[in-house]
Structures are given as structure tokens and as C-alpha cells.
Amino acid sequence: MVKAVCVLRGDAKVGGTVTFEQESESAPTTITYDLTGNDPNAERGFHIHTFGDNTNGCTSAGPHFNPHGKTHGAPTDAARHVGDLGNVKTDAQGNAKGSIQDSQVKLIGPHSVIGRTVVVHAGTDDLGKGGNEESLKTGNAGPRPACGVIGVAN
């Protein structure tokens, strides 16, 4: 079992933690999130970005992690970036808690997400269905109020 954790911080009030667990390279990864400070009753883009570099805030994290050169999509789409985790839904207080299983996100192997950055976006991810070029790259999810580097956990 490999475990990883990400502490999300930013220049806004958005923050939280994301944990990752994977039994073996062929097993799906369980991603559990606990986020606070978002807009109430909203859907916010949730992605893994390529670089673990936050020197200039969340913009230094680069584009979505996409080792297979695909277009942006929903987590259930065949054509998607590895880093496309869709949206998190917030409650009336702007908090989001949940867990997802993802077979493309890996902690083990050549395309591990350890050392990369999780970003919570200020807008809703259109899941690549926005009908424009930016939709196929970013899902038009907007600015990056919070992010954090994924690190190995005990």
C-alpha cells in the first residue's frame, strides 16, 4: 500500500487536505478530499497538475497532468488527462468532503502523481464539453485559489 497526502493552501480562503491510497500498480487509487472555504452550493474544478512547483503560487503547477497526450475530459471518459478529477460539490457552507476511486491516477509506476500538484479551481469544470479550444485543455475551470504538492505519506 502506497499513501500520499496533499495540503491545499492559497491566496484565498480555500484550503483542505487530499489523501491518496493505492494497493498495487494495477489497482485503482482512492482519493479522499476534505475542502473548506469554497463558494457555497457550487461545483469546483479539481485537478492534478504536472509540476510540484508552487513558487509563483498555483500557476507554477503548469497544465493538467497528461502523460498520454489526450484532450481534457470527465473522470469517466476514455479521452481525458490523468489529472482530470472532475468537480467537487460544495455544501451550503462551502465545504466539500468525499472520496473517489480512479484507475488512471497512480501512486506507483512511471506515471505516479507523487510530487505533482492538486489544484482546486474557482470555476466549474465543463468536462471538455464547452465547445471551444480551452475546454479541451482546461475545462474552463478558471483561476486557481488553492493548491498543494502531493507527498509520500506514512
Curated annotation (Swiss-Prot):
Renumbered to this chain, the Basic and acidic residues biased-composition regions fall at: 125-136
Q: Name one GO molecular function term.
A: superoxide dismutase activity
This entry's comment on the bound cofactor is:
Binds 1 copper ion per subunit. Binds 1 zinc ion per subunit.
Question: Keywords in UniProt for this one?
Answer: Antioxidant, Copper, Cytoplasm, Disulfide bond, Metal-binding, Oxidoreductase, Zinc
Q: Just give the chief location class.
A: cytoplasm
Q: Which residues bind Cu cation?
A: H47, H49, H64, H121
The UniProt record lists the EC number as 1.15.1.1
Residue positions binding Zn(2+): H64, H72, H81, D84
Concerning Gene3D superfamilies, the annotation shows: Superoxide dismutase, copper/zinc binding domain
Per UniProt, the enzyme's principal EC class comes to oxidoreductase
Residue span of region Disordered: 125-144
Q: Name one GO cellular component term.
A: cytoplasm
Instruction: Please name the InterPro entries in this protein's record.
Output: SOD-like_Cu/Zn_dom_sf, SOD_Cu/Zn_/chaperone, SOD_Cu/Zn_BS, SOD_Cu_Zn_dom
The superkingdom listed in its UniProt entry is Eukaryota
Q: Where in the cell is it found?
A: Cytoplasm
Pfam families recorded = Sod_Cu
- Disulfide-bonded cysteine pairs: these are C58-C147
Under the heading SUPFAM superfamilies, the entry gives: Cu,Zn superoxide dismutase-like
Q: Where does substrate bind?
A: R144
Reaction catalysed by this chain?
Answer: 2 superoxide + 2 H(+) = H2O2 + O2
User: What family is it from?
Assistant: Belongs to the Cu-Zn superoxide dismutase family.
Cite the record's note on assembly: Homodimer.
Q: What does this protein do?
A: Destroys radicals which are normally produced within the cells and which are toxic to biological systems.
Q: What is this protein called?
A: Superoxide dismutase [Cu-Zn]
* Organism the protein comes from: Cordyceps tenuipes (Entomopathogenic fungus)
The encoding gene is SOD1
